[in-house]
Amino acid sequence: MHRSPLAWLRLLLAAVLGAFLLGGPLHAAETAATRSPAWAQAVDPSINLYRMSPTLYRSALPNAQSVALLQRLQVKTVVSFIKDDDRAWLGQAPVRVLSLPTHADRVDDAEVLSVLRQLQAAEREGPVLMHCKHGNNRTGLFAAMYRIVVQGWDKQAALEEMQHGGFGDEDDMRDASAYVRGADVDGLRLAMANGECSPSRFAVCHVREWMAQALDRP
């Protein structure tokens, strides 16, 4: 049967549209099926809120409407990596606020170890939420290093979660990814276990310790 060029064009467009409509659900199903159950689980996508463990959550900057949810989650401490005052949205909610402003493009090992220790200390008092502005770069960096140093994940597994866990575009996490890729995992774990401020003996924090000790000598 002879078909006009217009008819063939209509058939082609219908085929392309059908493939697109079918491909979307299939891709979504494939993504859901391949997402590791060990990765942080979504709680409230509107603020990029995810549950990393029973005592640790991560998110973008929350708002006043988030307070009721955080109270249901029994969050006791909010750790912020930005300069904004969390009391602006928390109000008088009975939540401890810990302000640790950082920059993912120039974070160092001493800062990472300090944050990890403060997260662990806060977790002993109850669930903790850590956040930055968008919940992917600064928060992603500390979440990945928590996975690696505290929970014992390997570097690649932590990077996979960071980049494909649904927290944002991979391009938005370039600084965090660069730090994680270059991190001295063994050195950080050893320093964490030994209570040292940095894996490097020449880090500024160690120099300060030496100077303080020297000044204390009679």
Swiss-Prot record:
Its EC number is 3.1.3.16, 3.1.3.48. It catalyses: O-phospho-L-tyrosyl-[protein] + H2O = L-tyrosyl-[protein] + phosphate; O-phospho-L-threonyl-[protein] + H2O = L-threonyl-[protein] + phosphate; O-phospho-L-seryl-[protein] + H2O = L-seryl-[protein] + phosphate. One of its GO terms (cellular component) is periplasmic space. Residues 44-188 form the Tyrosine-protein phosphatase domain. The active site is at 105 (proton donor/acceptor), 132 (phosphocysteine intermediate). One of its GO terms (molecular function) is phosphatase activity. Adopts a canonical dual specific tyrosine phosphatase (DUSP) fold, similar to eukaryotic DUSPs. Conformational changes occur upon ligand binding. PANTHER family: DUAL SPECIFICITY PROTEIN PHOSPHATASE TPBA (PTHR31126:SF72), TYROSINE-PROTEIN PHOSPHATASE (PTHR31126). This is Dual specificity protein phosphatase TpbA. It comes from Pseudomonas aeruginosa (strain ATCC 15692 / DSM 22644 / CIP 104116 / JCM 14847 / LMG 12228 / 1C / PRS 101 / PAO1). The lineage of its organism: Bacteria, Pseudomonadati, Pseudomonadota, Gammaproteobacteria, Pseudomonadales.
